[in-house]
């Protein structure tokens, strides 16, 4: 007997795979997974037909253009997927009475704060990626009556490409690396985030949440910690500034998220990022 039907967009990504695994552990849960090929979120009619046919209880919306520099160079594509695609998902989900989980980003903030951002702080994205994801948030709040917006940051996991995998690969090819030290955020293990979302989606505590592994670091410190924990002591990491990379899109200098609403609702918080990273690296051996 099916007690819970969950539909996931972009289910082949690193977070999507972990979410599918987590939901399938729940007795009586059916998971319907759509990759890019099966559902084009920019096509309103297609989205409405697929959601109306399956009638899910929960929709987890992960489909997004997450290439920060690519979004800056092709803003139309960014807004088409991240904003209008999210509108299409929100409208279709509302029509069948489904709860909607929209995964957003720390890049909705400008990075000028001196303290971690709460869910109630003013958003002010400085990149097209951040602006398009914030537009998606606004469509979700405008069209869905049962939504969870989950802002997160610096994801890595078993599936797909990510910063940790890149560092481990480069350590096989080089003895030294340059990594930026003027961007600070919170690395987040997708397994931990998936567990949080799986639990949250089965509540009625609707609203916006900040969910990352706790604590913060710069990309430089993150890279150093990866090499230390992995026993790659031959690696020398040097600091550079973001401006030296000459990237198309600006990045917030400080985008640490305060889990204020998690604490307010008495929900279990995510563990420290160092602890999560250690487990991830153990699983890679």
Regions found by a protein language model. Name each.
Residues 5-24:
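N-terminal Rossmann NAD(P)H-binding glycine-rich loop of SDR-like oxidoreductase domains
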Residues 9, 34, 59-63, 100-105, ...:
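SDR active-site strand-loop-helix element
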Residues 14, 203-248, 253:
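Mid/C-terminal beta-alpha module of Rossmann-like enzyme folds, strongest
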Residues 27-49:
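Adenosine-cofactor binding site in Rossmann-like domains, unifying the SAM/SAH pocket
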Residues 44-81:
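NAD(P)H-binding glycine-rich loop region in Rossmannoid oxidoreductase-like domains
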Residues 80, 84-88, 95, 108-150, ...:
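Catalytic helix-loop patch of NAD(P)-dependent Rossmann-fold dehydrogenases
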Residues 138-185, 191-192, 198-199:
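NAD(P)-dependent short-chain dehydrogenase/reductase
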Residues 218-224, 241-285:
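Conserved C-terminal active-site "lid" loop/helix of NAD(P)H-dependent oxidoreductases
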